[in-house]
Amino acid sequence: MSVFFSRTVDKSRVWLWYSAFLCLVTAGPAFGDAPRNLILMIPDGMGPAAVTLARSYWGELVMDQILVGSASVASTNYQIPDSAATATAIATGVNTFNRAIAVDDERRPLLTLIESAEKNGMLTGLVVTSPIQHATPAAFTAHVDHRDKYRQIAAQQLEQGVDLMLGGGAKYLAAGPVTDEDIAANDLVTAMALPDQPDILWYPDLYQKAKEAGYQLITTRAELAQARLPVLGIFARDWLTAPLDRLHGDEDDEPDLAEMTRFALDRLAGNDQSFVLLIEGSTIDSAGHYYDPGWLVHDVREFDQALSVALDFARQREDTLLVAMTDHETGGLSLGRMLRDEQVGEKDYSRDWNLDILRRQKATVMGMLKQIRQGGNPVDVFVENTGITTIYPDQKKSLMGIPGMDLDDEDIEEDAMRVIGAVLSSHVKVDWTTRFHTAVDVGVYAYGPGAERFAGYHPNWQIGRIIAELMDLPVAGTSVGREQFAIDQSGKPSKPLE
């Protein structure tokens, strides 16, 4: 008699058997015992609402196929983290303080996944749309107590010997004078006095050091196809162009994230060595900081396209672990403005967000501000790039105030972008609760050998430890000098290094 109809069988046991049966028939592909390669992807600033908005715009996302869990993001000194602390947690398996680049609360350097991979004879690479010296890539390839020490990070990255580095950040590699910002960040380790002008501090040419170290230097998309390892590809002075601005602009020399991902996988997998590859969709975070939903959906899609390339690669093999997880959410995005069914004053408060506006948007708020700085009338620039013609008096006043702002001040320039973003978002009917990060849990995605280990909830530093265990890379609880120390339940070292 079938157990499903037997009166003598406990119902709870039947349910367990049935659940086990479902697990068997729905199980994914079989993999080897341990992964040989690691592809780690970070969509910087992409929270749950960003995924929802992007999915409503583009349809089902590739990342939806491999969503397995969630992670909390608190650092050791704040519930709301920054990218340096979260990247360090993932890279080292140790929780740390905001602004820290691969150091613990005592400022001791921590061994990272990429460093451990290099010590074990693996190839390593990083692909980002930020400067390569920015917080996330830096936390895998350098050790400083403050993320703003970009020149020091740049020098350490070259000493590290990462086989492939693609992104922006030319201004931190070129020779140049020490600035007030550099002094404020105490980023003076690599500076030197000029022989004929001892009162002037100057940074050396790190491009020359890269050449001496054997790197092939490339700066354009055309050069990328012919490049070989080791390669340093720097395609922008600062950040790479946002996908939305690239779509409607003329920045043809910059590769997109999927192109760089495809190139990196081809080169790193083109021999018998295993590899660790870090990929970051860096400017999703920028879209959240500046309240730009159109920028956001295009950046999430660019990341998803790169993830598709990585997932296709992993699906063709049984030896590659793909893990993607957000470092933190940015902006506190809220979708829709549900108050009541009727209009409130002159403004239409609808329950639904307006995707038609995003489909008409031709420039990010950064792109629009650039046009305003070139002399464009703020309202005309806004209308031209969004298709929005009904602009309320308070919104028009805000936009027209932009030319009077001190746009040479970086903080004020960012405020100007938020002015444009706030007007845009009000018409799209989405909202933002902060110009900074939030503490909400973020998504974790995984495919390949050991992917089931990421199911459910974990603190972000535990994700780093699981990756290290699966890859057999000694990271968590290890300093750069290989000293071991214990990790407590909060992810912090529980005793000093000996």
Residue ranges of predicted features:
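Bacterial N-terminal signal peptides that target proteins for export
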Residues: 5-18
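A short glycine/threonine-centered beta-strand motif
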Residues: 42-43
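Glycine-rich anion/phosphate-binding loops
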Residues: 102-111, 144, 148
